C-alpha cells in the first residue's frame, strides 16, 4: 500500500474510527431512549453491555483488519485460508452500500436545513411552521435528489483524496470541532432557567423505568452504535501500523462514542426543560423540535446553525467509511484509480438511493411489506445484514482465526498470566456468549 493508504498517526485512526461510530443514532435517538428508560440506570446498563459486548467485537474487527492488511472482501479468505469465508466481507460491503444509499438522503436533508437556517439568520428567509417546512422538503423530488447528490459528492471528494489526505484530514478537523460545538451548545443550554431539571430527567437513575425493550435497545446499541459487523472498523484497522495498541484504541473509540451520546442529552434536555417542551427522538427532533426550541432563546438561530453543523459532521464522518470500504474493495486498497472508482461507486449509490429519497414524496404510497422503500432499506441493513455480520464476525474470530494472529495483533505477552486470562475471556465471549446475545437481539426485533 502507498503512504496515503495508511494512517499518518494513531490519533487520526482513533478520530476516524470514532467518527464512523458516532452517527445520527448516537445524537438523536440514544439520549431520548436513555431518558425514557431510567436515565443514569440505563446508561450504566449500556456501559456494561458496551464493555462486555461492543468492545470485544470491535477488537475482533481491529484484529482481523490489521492481521490481514488487505481489503475487507479478501480479509476473511486470507485469514481463514479458504476463499469461501470471503462471503462475510461481501455481506459487509453490500450492507454499507445500501446503508449509504439511504443515509445520504438524511445527509441531504441536513444540508438543505443548514442552507435555510443560514438564510433565516441573515433575514433572507423566515420560517414559523417547521413541521410544514420539513414535509415540504422531504416530499419535493428535486430538493430531495439534489441534496442527496450534494451529500454524496462531499463523500466522493473526501474518499478520493485517500486515507491520509482525505479521511484522516477530514476527521482531524471535524471531530474536534464536533466536540467544541457540543460544549458551546451545552454551556448555553445549562445557562437557561430550570435547566437542571432537564439534567435530572436525563441522568437521574431510576431502575423502575428500565423496560425489556429498553434493555434490548441497550444490547443492540452496544454493538450497532460502534459500526460493527459491516467491516467498517476492519477496513480502518487494515490501514494501521503494527505498533498501535488495538486495545487502547478500542477503548478510546468506545469512550468517545459514549461521551457524544451523553453530551447530546446535555445539549438538548436542559433547554427543553427550560421551555417546557416534550422530548422525542429521530428526524423530528432535529428538523421540527429543535428549530422551535432555539427560536425561543437569544441568539437561538446561531445555535441551531451550530447544531446542524454538528449533525453534518457526525453524518459525514460516519458516511465516508461506507464509501471507502467499497472503493478499497475494488482498488485492493491501493490509490490506483481511487478517484475514478470513488465517482463510479458514488454514482451507483445515488441511483440506488433514488427510491429512498422519493419515499416521502412521489413514492410515498409505494409500500413493500408494508414499508416505504426508505424504511425497507433501513430494516434490511439494521435488522438483517448488521446482525448477520456481527454473528459471522464473532464466530469467525472465535473458531476460525488462528489464535497466534490474535495474540500478535493484541500485543499479548504469553508469559504474562493477566494478559493471557483477559485474552481467554475475550475468546470465550466471542465463542459462546456473543453469538447467543446477537441471536436474541435479532429475533426480538421480529417479535
Task: Tell where the protein language model's regions lie, with residue ranges.
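A generic transmembrane alpha-helix motif of multi-pass inner-membrane proteins
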Residues: 145, 372-395, 418-447
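Helix-loop-helix connectors at the membrane interface of multi-pass transporters/channels
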Residues: 107-139, 239-243, 248, 252-260, ...
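Hydrophobic, membrane-embedded alpha-helices of multi-pass small-molecule transporters
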Residues: 8, 15-25, 100, 104, ...
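Loop-to-transmembrane helix boundary motifs in multi-pass membrane proteins
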Residues: 12-14, 20, 145-146, 256-262, ...
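Membrane-embedded translocation segments of transport machinery
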Residues: 2-7, 168, 172-316, 340-341
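Transmembrane helix-boundary motif of multi-pass solute transporters/channels
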Residues: 12-49, 231-237, 247-251, 255-256, ...
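Membrane-interface "cap" regions at the ends of multi-pass membrane proteins
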Residues: 1-28, 57-62, 66-79, 83-90, ...
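Inter-helical loop and helix-membrane interface segments of multi-pass membrane transporters/permeases
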Residues: 4, 32-37, 67-91, 104-164, ...
